């Protein structure tokens, strides 16, 4: 192998090692980009509350009738009440 081929191979190998893991676009993407605000509480099977350093409070709900996951607006009144009750329960225990 000549020196140019070896140098090129080393550079390519180095760039592969640096690109391991998730692409930058996936690392910083928040799970919720759109929020639903008019979903009745009775249509929700369960909620997941997500909070990451890169994203604001994210609330993901699974719907009863079709199992679809949607993101709920955390500013919705019934969600704020739900979160307040959940936090109060956690503080008491």
Swiss-Prot record:
Site (Important for integrin interaction and activation): 45, 48, 64
Region feature (Receptor binding): 48-50, 60-64
An annotated GO BP: integrin activation
Top-rank taxon: Eukaryota
Swiss-Prot/TrEMBL keywords: Chemotaxis, Cytokine, Developmental protein, Disulfide bond, Gastrulation, Growth factor, Secreted, Signal
Key word tRNA-binding present: no
Signal peptide: 1-21
InterPro entries membership: Chemokine_b/g/d, Chemokine_IL8-like_dom, CXC_Chemokine_domain, Interleukin_8-like_sf
Receptor and heparin binding: annotated segments: 29-33
GO molecular function: chemokine activity; growth factor activity; integrin binding
Main location: secreted
Coiled coil spans: none
The keyword Secreted is annotated on this UniProt entry: yes
SMART domains, per the entry: SCY
Motif (Receptor activation motif): 22-23
One term under GO cellular component: extracellular space
Residues annotated as binding heparin: 41-51, 62, 69, 85
UniProt-annotated site: Important for dimer formation, residues: 46
Disulfide bonds, paired cysteine numbers: 30-55, 32-71
Localization of this protein: Secreted
Oligomeric form and interacting partners: Monomer or homodimer; in equilibrium. Dimer formation is induced by non acidic pH and the presence of multivalent anions, and by binding to cxcr4 or heparin.
Family: Belongs to the intercrine alpha (chemokine CxC) family.
Protein name: Stromal cell-derived factor 1
Organism per entry: Xenopus tropicalis
């Amino acid at each position: 192998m000549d020196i140019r081929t070896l140098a090129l191979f080393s550079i390519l190998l180095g760039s592969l090692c640096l690109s391991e893991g998730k692409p930058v676009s996936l690392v910083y993407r928040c799970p919720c980009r759109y929020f639903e605000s008019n979903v009745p509480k009775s249509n929700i099977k369960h909620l997941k509350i997500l909070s990451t350093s890169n994203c604001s409070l994210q609330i993901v709900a699974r719907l009863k009738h079709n199992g679809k996951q949607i993101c709920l607006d955390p500013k919705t009144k019934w969600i704020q009440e739900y979160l307040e009750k959940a936090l109060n329960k956690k503080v008491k225990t």
